[in-house]
């Protein structure tokens, strides 16, 4: 990580300290008695011609501050001069950041020119209570399983829970694509501790999809020091807050992956010598999560709707990291490996997932009733599966056989072709309106398509699409 040259030039006359100890990403710096930096101040050091930024985490006495490096510390040595910028790390803000890609320090990493724009500190207080507003406006995503079973609200927080390789990132990509095209919305994507290759692919996919000019990307990937991974979510959030507060916009903030934010905090906590808490996590886990999540909210100026991918270690939802995240969310989308193994994508488990706004007063009575009937049908099918496994379908009553057939059709119909997956699947992506989704599931539940085999429901957009495919094959 390298800070911008302007920052260095501007601060040439600032207070200078000396490095007295380097322990991996932890650097201790000694200042004079009257010039000790504040917690979270950014310090700058020249590391063999490269500018390295250190963030003050602790004041350990004797005029010494303990810092975490935002970049590699190879080549640092004792006695080097360190400049105090008298300011926290800052992020660039404004319309100019759209279509650009930055690191944790707000420096461009897309090989395009530097930006001379306003910058804001990444450490800020959450909006005060009087500024908050509670909205219950539904955000249409065009993804059937989400719009029907787990509706989003503008200004809400949504968690995507799932283990490795079940489709969290591609679901986020589809949401960005759909929101940009359907709602003309601005998105900020914070890549926290994920694969660099995925970030590169995402950038080029955004260019191909034509949504890059509505998106700002901020990356602190898994090859970077824990300090960068811990702070990059705050950089992305600061950019989103500016669009909300100063431009009065509804913004989408995507964080992939919020678990890596916790993981980086755990690494930093251990490096700073704090006593670990449950399962080895940092004792400040809830505080760190709260300080991030409380800033993601709706105000009278605009809203930030957040979608956060949550890696679940060993698929254990009781792990402290995902469990702490749960408490802040309005909706939870749980991705299930067993559904993915059936070839059904998005692999959303409609029984484990939930949304606070699936309420008849918000989504309407018909929508609520259909969603509830879908849940009941799938739940009943799950209960019957053990009987089917032992005795077979023939031992079921006629009523139960009908439930099983409809449940399998519902399960298949919850699949959907994604725009961002077109080149992998060969199937064109579809955006399905909420009204079409509700109407289609109503037809299945009412028995209007009991005569159509379940295979026709897989990757069909609406019930009209199912009937069209069935009639076409029947005519052959």
From Swiss-Prot:
ATP binds at residues 162-169. Transmembrane segments: none annotated. GO terms for cellular component: plasma membrane; proton-transporting ATP synthase complex. It catalyses: ATP + H2O + 4 H(+)(in) = ADP + phosphate + 5 H(+)(out). Keywords: ATP synthesis, ATP-binding, Cell membrane, CF(1), Hydrogen ion transport, Ion transport, Membrane, Nucleotide-binding, Translocase, Transport. It is found in: Cell membrane. CDD domains: ATP-synt_F1_beta_C, ATP-synt_F1_beta_N, F1-ATPase_beta_CD. InterPro entries: AAA+_ATPase, ATP-synt_VA_C, ATP_synth_F1_bsu, ATPase_a/bsu_AS, ATPase_alpha/beta_chains, ATPase_F1/V1/A1_a/bsu_N, ATPase_F1/V1/A1_a/bsu_N_sf, ATPase_F1/V1/A1_a/bsu_nucl-bd. Its main location: membrane. One of its GO terms (molecular function) is ATP hydrolysis activity. It is a peripheral membrane protein. F-type ATPases have 2 components, CF(1) - the catalytic core - and CF(0) - the membrane proton channel. CF(1) has five subunits: alpha(3), beta(3), gamma(1), delta(1), epsilon(1). CF(0) has three main subunits: a(1), b(2) and c(9-12). The alpha and beta chains form an alternating ring which encloses part of the gamma chain. CF(1) is attached to CF(0) by a central stalk formed by the gamma and epsilon chains, while a peripheral stalk is formed by the delta and b chains. Produces ATP from ADP in the presence of a proton gradient across the membrane. The catalytic sites are hosted primarily by the beta subunits. NCBIfam families: atpD. HAMAP family: ATP_synth_beta_bact. Belongs to the ATPase alpha/beta chains family. This is ATP synthase subunit beta.
């Amino acid at each position: 990580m390298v800070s911008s040259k302007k920052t260095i030039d501007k601060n040439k006359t600032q207070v200078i300290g000396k490095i007295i100890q380097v322990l991996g990403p932890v650097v201790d710096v000694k200042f004079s008695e009257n010039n000790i930096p504040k917690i979270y101040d950014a310090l700058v050091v020249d590391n063999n011609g490269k500018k390295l930024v250190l963030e003050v985490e602790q004041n350990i006495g004797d005029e010494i501050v303990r810092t975490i490096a935002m970049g590699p510390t190879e080549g640092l040595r004792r006695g080097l001069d360190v400049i105090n910028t008298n300011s926290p790390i800052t992020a660039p803000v404004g319309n100019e950041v759209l279509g650009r890609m930055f690191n944790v320090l707000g420096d461009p990493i897309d090989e395009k020119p530097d930006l001379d724009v306003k910058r804001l500190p990444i450490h800020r207080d959450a909006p005060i209570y009087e500024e908050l507003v509670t909205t219950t406006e539904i955000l249409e995503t065009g993804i059937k399983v989400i719009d029907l079973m787990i509706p989003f609200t503008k200004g809400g927080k949504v968690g995507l829970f799932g283990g490795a390789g079940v489709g969290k990132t591609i679901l986020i990509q589809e949401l960005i694509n759909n929101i940009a095209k359907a709602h003309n919305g601005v998105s900020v994507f914070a890549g926290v501790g994920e694969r660099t290759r995925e970030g590169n692919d995402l950038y080029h996919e955004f260019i191909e999809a034509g949504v890059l000019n509505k998106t700002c990307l901020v990356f602190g990937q898994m090859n970077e020091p824990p300090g960068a991974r811990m702070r990059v979510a705050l950089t992305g959030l600061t950019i989103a807050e500016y669009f909300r507060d100063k431009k009065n916009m509804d913004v989408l903030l995507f964080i992939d992956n919020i678990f890596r934010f916790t993981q980086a905090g755990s690494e930093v906590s251990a490096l700073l010598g704090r006593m670990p808490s449950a399962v080895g996590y940092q004792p400040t886990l809830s505080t760190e999560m709260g300080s991030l999540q409380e800033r993601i909210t709706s105000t009278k100026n605009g809203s930030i709707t957040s979608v956060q991918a949550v890696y679940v270690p060993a698929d254990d939802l009781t792990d402290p990291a995902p469990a702490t995240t749960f408490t802040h969310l309005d909706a939870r989308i749980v991705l299930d490996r067993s559904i993915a193994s059936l070839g059904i994508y998005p692999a959303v488990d409609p029984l484990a997932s939930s949304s606070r706004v699936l309420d008849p007063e918000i989504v309407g009575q018909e929508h609520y009733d259909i969603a509830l009937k879908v849940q009941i049908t799938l739940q009943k099918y799950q209960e019957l599966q053990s009987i089917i496994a032992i005795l077979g379908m023939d031992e079921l009553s006629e009523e139960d056989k009908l439930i099983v057939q409809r449940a399998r059709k519902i399960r298949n119909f919850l699949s959907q072709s994604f725009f961002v997956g077109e080149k992998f699947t060969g199937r064109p992506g579809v955006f399905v309106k909420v009204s079409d989704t509700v109407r289609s599931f109503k037809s299945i539940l009412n028995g209007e398509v009991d005569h159509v085999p379940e295979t026709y429901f897989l990757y069909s957009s609406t019930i009209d699409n199912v009937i069209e495919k069935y009639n076409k094959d029947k005519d052959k």
